[in-house]
C-alpha cells in the first residue's frame, strides 16, 4: 500500500503558499497556481512544511490523500521549474510552425491544422518537426500535449504522426501478400 499522502511537502525559498478555507494558492518565481482542496482532506501549513491528513481510512479518503498531496507538490514544483512536454512530428511534409499566438501544423490533411495557445501555456518550435509545450501547471501541459497528439496520432505501419519524444511506437508488419 502506498504511503505517499503521509510524506510532508517542503516549500522551497521564494515560494509563498496560502490557504483560505479550502482554496490553496501557490505563488512562485514562474507564476501563481490556485486549486480547491477536497472537503475530506485537511491541509496544514507549519513554517515551510505542508502536511495533508485524512479523516479516516475509507477507500475514497485513502485515494484522495495521496492525490491531494501529489497535486500540491506538483503546484510547488511548477511555480519553481516549468513543466514541459516534447512532441515530435514524423512524416513527409508534416511540419509545425508558430504564427503569433497560434500553432499551425501541416499534417497531411487538405488544410493546415491551427491551434490557439491556451492561457498559461507557451509553445516552442525549435525546428519544423519538434513542438515543446511549456507551462507551470502540469495538468494543463499534459492535456495540451495530448490534444496536439490527437490531431494526427502515430500510425503503426509507417510510424507517421505526432508522438511524444520519449514514446516508442510498436510497428506492425504489412500484409504478407499472395504467393
Language-model segment annotations:
Residues 2-146, 150-179:
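N-terminal intrinsically disordered, cationic/polar leader segments
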Amino acid at each position: 500500500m502506498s504511503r505517499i499522502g503521509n510524506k510532508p511537502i517542503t516549500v522551497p525559498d521564494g515560494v509563498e503558499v496560502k490557504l483560505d478555507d479550502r482554496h490553496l494558492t501557490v505563488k512562485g518565481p514562474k507564476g501563481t497556481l490556485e486549486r480547491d482542496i477536497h472537503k475530506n482532506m485537511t491541509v496544514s501549513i507549519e513554517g515551510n512544511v505542508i502536511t495533508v491528513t485524512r479523516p479516516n481510512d475509507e477507500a475514497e479518503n485513502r485515494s484522495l490523500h495521496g492525490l491531494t498531496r501529489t497535486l500540491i507538490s506538483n503546484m510547488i514544483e511548477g511555480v519553481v521549474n516549468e513543466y514541459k512536454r516534447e512532441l515530435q512530428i514524423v512524416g513527409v511534409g508534416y511540419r509545425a510552425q508558430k504564427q503569433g499566438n497560434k500553432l499551425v501544423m501541416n499534417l497531411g490533411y487538405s488544410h493546415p491544422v491551427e491551434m490557439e495557445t491556451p492561457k498559461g501555456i507557451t509553445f516552442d518550435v525549435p525546428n519544423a518537426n519538434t513542438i515543446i509545450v511549456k507551462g507551470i501547471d502540469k495538468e494543463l501541459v499534459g492535456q495540451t500535449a495530448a490534444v496536439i497528439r490527437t490531431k494526427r496520432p502515430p500510425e503503426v505501419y509507417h510510424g507517421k504522426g505526432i508522438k511524444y519524444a520519449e514514446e516508442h511506437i510498436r510497428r506492425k508488419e504489412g500484409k504478407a501478400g499472395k504467393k
